[in-house]
């Protein structure tokens, strides 16, 4: 195995751990988890949740350092559009587009003292345009 494959494997493992941390965080915050890793040819959404009457499509991002910015800053417009595409597919299969929907980001920063988790509600809109930055 080359170093690049090892690093990629480490990133994937960290990503899976971040998704588990995000799911537990959202559950404790009162979100109902509806689905995980809903994927289509056009995109994927990490978590589908319900907060009250709102269906929330959640992108989970993680970093080991904020020296280059927080994990939430790594969601570009292209990634947001892919999440929206997967969310649209999920909504059409599960109640239709008339549901109230929101696109959130959960940022997990792995620190020595333990992971730091932040929720950004409405991080981008249904067209993939950022709402936070």
Curated annotation (Swiss-Prot):
One of its GO terms (molecular function) is nucleic acid binding. It comes from the Bacteria. It holds the Pfam family UPF0102. InterPro entries: Restrct_endonuc-II-like (IPR011335), tRNA_endonuc-like_dom_sf (IPR011856), UPF0102_YraN-like (IPR003509). HAMAP family: UPF0102. Belongs to the UPF0102 family. PANTHER family: UPF0102 PROTEIN YRAN. This is UPF0102 protein Anae109_1947. It comes from Anaeromyxobacter sp. (strain Fw109-5).
